[in-house]
């Protein structure tokens, strides 16, 4: 049994971590911090956990966190990098659900997040936690940068094409049209997130530039093993009036080799042994409600024209897009079965 700390337990990803870990047979949450709710029982804030835990929120105490085997940071950007060096020096592993360890390019990090990186030496040795594509490195990692929710759908949606020995798509013409429920914006109150602003409404945001764009580009370059080939990639996220769920529609142009490839078989073979990636039959339509509450991503392919491919990828942004994937990474880091604590089936209806 490993001991777990969660820094930032009052946000949506923090409480989702707690919900998942309370069912984990080999992990026990011992520390749960909050800057604003110290001393308050968790079940008083989240009644779904009543009867399942007697934990109370506490102030962040680095010495208490050092006693844990692993600490998750479900905090704003910039928090984990302030504490990661001390924790790993004490032998504690770190999994950050913010952006502190996602981008290796410091210039891009500082540009998009408006801060200098506090521990570039730790960043250099950290591992990007897209589980299905980085499994062996994750097993050896001390610090994990958990991927963003949108980048998770994009990477898993495109990986079979980019990992192929042949160039199957035109990498400069990729268009990503992505939609997310409002929980992706976090729990902090803001005018744009209140019910009357979002109900019966549907809008794009970050059209001029979104923080996940450089993460997507860097990650795709690593998958493809090529630099500067995704300059023309377009990414536009949208906010839809639902609580959880994410659907990314990815449009690509096929090369001559891509036109001749059995793409459905390519995807089915690539993900044949993956427990959390479901390749649906061709021309299917993955629905967000089918993965609600589950650590699963569903993919479907359409080929509307000989030189065009549409990839649909659906996930729960709080689970496979955040906390579930973080626990998946934790399982690998400690040698557990990868699906330990993550066998939940999506909630439907």
Curated annotation (Swiss-Prot):
UniProt organism field: Acinetobacter baumannii (strain AYE)
Family annotation (NCBIfam families): argC (TIGR01850)
Active site per database record: 149
Pathway the protein acts in: Amino-acid biosynthesis; L-arginine biosynthesis; N(2)-acetyl-L-ornithine from L-glutamate: step 3/4
Family of this protein: Belongs to the NAGSA dehydrogenase family. Type 1 subfamily.
SMART domains on file: Semialdhyde_dh
Protein function: Catalyzes the NADPH-dependent reduction of N-acetyl-5-glutamyl phosphate to yield N-acetyl-L-glutamate 5-semialdehyde.
Subcellular location: Cytoplasm
Name of protein: N-acetyl-gamma-glutamyl-phosphate reductase
Keywords: Amino-acid biosynthesis, Arginine biosynthesis, Cytoplasm, NADP, Oxidoreductase
One of the record's GO cellular component terms: cytoplasm
GO process terms (BP): L-arginine biosynthetic process
One Pfam family per UniProt: Semialdhyde_dh
InterPro entries recorded: AGPR_AS (IPR023013), AGPR_type-1 (IPR000706), NAD(P)-bd_dom_sf (IPR036291), NAGSA_dehydrogenase (IPR050085), Semialdehyde_DH_NAD-bd (IPR000534)
Enzyme class at the top of the EC tree: oxidoreductase
Keyword set includes GTP-binding: no
Recorded name of the encoding gene: argC
GO molecular function per UniProt: N-acetyl-gamma-glutamyl-phosphate reductase activity; NAD binding; NADP+ binding
EC number in record: 1.2.1.38
Alphabetized SUPFAM superfamilies for the sequence: Glyceraldehyde-3-phosphate dehydrogenase-like, C-terminal domain, NAD(P)-binding Rossmann-fold domains
Signal peptide: none
Reaction equation(s) it catalyzes: N-acetyl-L-glutamate 5-semialdehyde + phosphate + NADP(+) = N-acetyl-L-glutamyl 5-phosphate + NADPH + H(+)
